[in-house]
Amino acid sequence: MINSLKIDAGEFEKITPLTLDGAVPWNENARYVKNEKVGGDPYHCAGLYYMQEPSAACVAPKAEAKRGERVLDLCAAPGGKTVALAAAMQGEGILVCNEPVRARAQILLSNIERSGVKNAVVLNAYPEEICDYFTEYFDKIVADAPCSGEGMFRKNAEEARREWSEENVSLCAARQQKILDSAAKMLA
């Protein structure tokens, strides 16, 4: 996803060393990329773009976050959707980014800083812990809740089979319900 906080899509397409393979239809700043190894790419390090699955690139356009709104990204790490929400808000309003897992919250913070997001604050708490502080506060809430990982069958079937179980699916469903219940309390 091209980070429109730092560069517009046309300019990025002119300078990128990546092999682009067309636009992702549901996000004007997302492109299909043929070569995905980007760790040392200076444009990636500078936050000009963020690698994410095309399916993840649909979240910010569907959320329709706008300038001046109060937006919560409830399960925010590693930060791609957060950056897209911040870009849609054009740096105005309040973007609260929450990640309950400390190590993932640190990655989230690093990605937000690298991407030049200035209107965000990062929290490290479980959703049910922040409800009382933000009751009926947010205009929009994004909750990419942790899941059973079934989508990984496409990428790494062997690993996905090792980690998948009916018990894990049930645990994830219960966790997702808690997250959605918390989100409902915080939506204005």
Which residues does each PLM region occupy?
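S-adenosylmethionine
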Residues: 1-188
